[in-house]
Amino acid sequence: MTVFPTLGLLFLCQLLATTSAQRVGPQGPPGPRGPPGPSGKDGIDGEPGPSGLPGPPGPKGAPGKPGAAGEAGLPGLPGVDGLTGTDGPPGPNGPPGDRGALGPAGPPGPAGKGLPGPPGPPGPSGLPGGNGFRGPPGPSGLPGFPGPPGPPGPPGLAGIIPEGGGDLQCPALCPPGPPGPPGMPGFKGHTGHKGGPGEIGKEGEKGSPGPPGPPGIPGSVGLQGPRGLRGLPGPMGPAGDRGDIGFRGPPGIPGPPGRAGDQGNKGPQGFRGPKGDTGRPGPKGNPGARGLIGEPGIPGKDGRDGAPGLDGEKGDAARMGVPGEKGPNGLPGLPGRAGIKGSKGEPGSPGEMGEAGPSGEPGIPGDVGIPGDRGLPGPRGATGPVGLPGPIGAPGVRGFQGPKGSSGEPGLPGPTGIRGESGDRGPAGVIGAKGSQGIAGADGLPGDKGELGPFGPPGQKGEPGKRGELGPKGAQGPNGTAGAPGIPGHPGPMGHQGEQGVPGITGKPGPPGKEASEQHIRELCGEMINDQIAQLAANLRKPLSPGMTGRPGPAGPPGPPGATGSVGHPGARGPPGYRGPTGELGDPGPRGDTGEKGDKGPAGQGIDGPDGDQGPQGLPGVPGISKNGRDGAQGEPGLPGDPGTPGAVGAQGTPGICDTSACMGAVGASTSKKS
């Protein structure tokens, strides 16, 4: 236990001894300022000191302006199709849409009739129609073959002869009489005249619809009709069942940076850190005052190049410069590299079910599906109500070709035809008589310049001509190429101190400092105390060994100014200067002698002159011979015509002839039905 107090006492004594030995005396008065010495070499950069404790957070800066919207990112890949959800309950039927336009007729169905449907139930009897008007007598038919002998009929009653007429009339009712002897088979009576068409009876009540017949053979798929008008939006259906969770989509575009957070609470004041290393040397001092100009000396001869001098000794360390004011804000840094893709996050909780969206527009009707297999016949359904009138049927079969129509009126003259190709060259015609002299044509364009002829012999010198007028100033020539860079000049005087820059953007708040504790103090000062104890122990073991190099002392006073040097040797030749601007054009020189006339050049190629005036109108042409054109192709079948109106009532026909045998046959048939 007594070792630690003694070591601590020795450590304190050593610290006091070292500090007292390195004390600096009082600073003397400043001496006169000497000429600036040669600039020393840059010292070796010291190692960066440990980062200091984070300072207190600054005040909260003003919110920044929102950044401009970034460019649109690349479109994401299409997502994987989700699983098909369960079908929702069918919605209520919407109101019937408007009737669409009639589509084109479909291709004919396969040959053959469909399977016959089962017979429907008999409909209710219609109301008896009114008696029709008797039509005109028809043409007499051919006599028929004699029929087989019929069974003996009952004896008939005595006929009634009406007054004023010789025609026999059938009684309203023929009651059966006692059986008579079998009579001879009679001959077939004369066929009566064909009666006229009776009056159209009233339309009977529509019978109850029969059961639906079996489905026929499915026809081929018809052409798709035009798209119908958009129907009224149906009522909103109930919300469907929730689908399965889809696959995770690609990551979206990163959003804009969030706003700066609120200023945090001020952290506890940190401990004072250890003293840092010596900083870098300060900026170079201002140049000294300019000396007096010496008398010009006699230029001496160029001396030989001297041997390179030895490197000078390292100068004293420069004093610490005054800390400069805060400079302007630096340029924005380069954009950082894209970060590593983050790990896949946990699947988010399923969101709440959203409200059902509005019904979408009705889709384009799809193609007719493949006909399915014939199903089993279902039970007979109840008789349904009378349906709405069906759509207009398909157009009828194409009619026969009608007779050839009369020739139509001559058509309008057609458009001018395309100019035909040039025909083969015809035989040479007979040379015609010489025509009258035409009007002189327009002057042709000047021909191309002929080739330069050979130079003639030099002629006699002519008289000197008069001095010509000063020509216009020529265009300024292009700038010459840039010369080699010159020798750098002397450094100029240091500029004035700049104005204080705009306060910079408040930095992000640093992490909160650690709380003051014994462990924290040991972490900061433990290594330094261990080094001091190790050095103290080494000095105690070797008291005669030289100690550590002390800190450099303060700079001494400047020395006296040196003598003025002699005139130096002339420097090396400088680089060539920049090319000057092009000078103005000089006065034109005297006119030269006229040369001899050259040889005649080759004939120039003429250029087609402009088109001449339009000639007089020619004689009328020979009238052409017209021919009937070919019959046009058969037109497409027309639309079905409107149903015709009922015709007028025909004239009343002549009274018919009643055959008693026919009446008897009718009575016999009625009795057989009753039995």
Swiss-Prot record:
Residues 126-135 have a biased composition (Gly residues). GO terms for cellular component: basement membrane; collagen type IX trimer; extracellular space. Residues 27-38, 51-60, 105-125, 136-155, 173-184 have a biased composition (Pro residues). Residues 25-515 are annotated as: Triple-helical region 3 (COL3). Residues 632-658 are annotated as: Triple-helical region 1 (COL1). One of its GO terms (molecular function) is extracellular matrix structural constituent conferring tensile strength. The keyword Glycoprotein applies. Prolines at the third position of the tripeptide repeating unit (G-X-Y) are hydroxylated in some or all of the chains. Residues 62-87, 218-233, 361-374, 481-508, 569-582, 613-624 have a biased composition (Low complexity). This is Collagen alpha-3(IX) chain. It comes from Gallus gallus (Chicken). The gene is COL9A3.
